[in-house]
Regions:
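A short, flexible loop at the N-terminus of ABC-type nucleotide-binding domains that lies
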Residues: 2-5, 14-27, 58-65, 81-84, ...
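Conserved ABC ATPase signature
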Residues: 151-156, 160
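Conserved ABC ATPase "signature" region
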Residues: 75-76, 128-147, 256-257
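Short catalytic/signature loops enriched in Gly
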Residues: 3-4, 143-147, 237-328
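Conserved ABC transporter NBD signature motif
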Residues: 65-76
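P-loop NTP-binding/switch modules centered on Walker-like glycine-rich loops
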Residues: 43, 57, 83, 173, ...
């Protein structure tokens, strides 16, 4: 089996406050293979975006990586100096954020921004970098790229700006792309186009993609595998088809049961009672136990570790008695 592009092992991220230390990420592990799209889904506050920021080394103080290891194609990157990590960002790891305006300088033409990024990571002349920029704009679906390359960010629609950001993310042909809610601010029809674009680029370039979103519809359309996060932990991870059609963790079951369907014989939508706990008030044992209809005494005391169950891994005591093995 080939080495994964991204390998995260027992990652812990903490934020220090005046009164206590809050653990936003609590011992998660996962891999992403070459050309694979891993969707990371969960409610607001589950730790999805913090996980992505930890991978690219952008956890701001008072936050810090408190434990665990992150590997990019075998190279450990969580302990690199800020300068070394800066060289990796953009060249080996591309980033797509929710609001494209935060990634684009409104005072510069998009061509200038693309050319600067390309020349930062490749030894190309100004003319060659401009030709590369035009090719990238065409690849991400910008019409008339020879003309639009001289446009400013405000002259593009939201969907077209996001395409420009994607072009920036792939201009150095990175091994990994972190896409954090890349379709949230877009119309539904534009969302579908961006989803298809990210999936195609990952396949065509062999790029690993970590897609962070709260939208299971986006995950189902785009991802090969999905990790369901809850209170800084991975509740369940597995092939997206298996997790959607046969979720194992009670929280994952609730998420899938809350997705509307057009089927005439569909069951009533599931409502998960309560809300995700604050970081300062995560209960002992399984963090989902106060909201879980299947919780028993062990759930309130002992943290469940991931158990491999078929193609999925689930962190739930309900599956301890099943024929399975503890996930590495």
């Amino acid at each position: 089996m080939s080495e994964p592009v991204l390998s995260v092992r027992n990652l812990r991220v903490e934020f220090a406050t005046r009164h206590q230390v809050l653990r936003a990420i609590d011992g998660i592990s996962f891999d992403i293979a070459k050309g694979e799209v891993l969707g990371v889904v969960g409610e607001s506050g589950a730790g999805k975006s913090v996980t992505g920021l930890a991978v690219i080394g952008l956890i701001d103080r008072p936050g810090r990586i408190a434990g665990g290891e992150i590997y990019l194609s075998g190279l450990r990157i969580d302990n690199l100096s800020p300068e070394d990590m800066r060289r990796i960002r953009g060249k080996r790891i591309g980033m797509i954020f929710q609001d494209p305006l935060t990634s684009l300088n409104p005072l510069y033409r998009i061509g200038d921004q693309l050319v600067e990024t390309i020349r930062t990571h490749a030894s190309l002349s100004e003319a060659a970098a401009r030709r590369r920029a035009i090719d990238l704009l065409a690849e991400v679906g910008i019409p008339a790229p020879e003309k639009r390359i001289d446009s400013y960010p405000h002259e593009f629609s939201g969907g077209m700006r996001q395409r420009v950001v994607i072009a920036l993310a792939i201009c150095a042909e990175p091994e990994l792309i972190i896409a954090d809610e890349p379709t949230t601010a877009l119309d539904v029809s534009v969302q579908a186009q961006i989803i298809a674009l990210i999936k195609r680029l990952g396949r065509d370039h062999g790029t690993a993609v970590m897609l962070v979103t709260h939208d299971m519809g986006v995950i189902a359309e785009t991802s090969d595998r999905v990790a369901v996060m809850y209170s800084g932990r991975i509740a369940e991870i597995g092939p997206v088809r298996d997790v959607v059609q046969n979720p194992l963790h009670p929280y994952a079951k609730g998420l899938m049961g809350a997705i509307p369907t057009l089927a005439s014989d569909a069951a009533r939508l599931v409502q998960i009672p309560g809300s995700m706990p604050r970081l300062s008030a995560i209960p002992p044992g399984c963090p989902f136990n106060p909201r879980c209809a299947f919780a028993f005494d062990r759930c309130r005391i002992e943290r469940p570790e991931p158990i491999v169950h078929g193609t999925q891994a689930v962190a739930c005591h309900l599956y301890d008695a099943a024929p399975a093995e503890t996930a590495a």
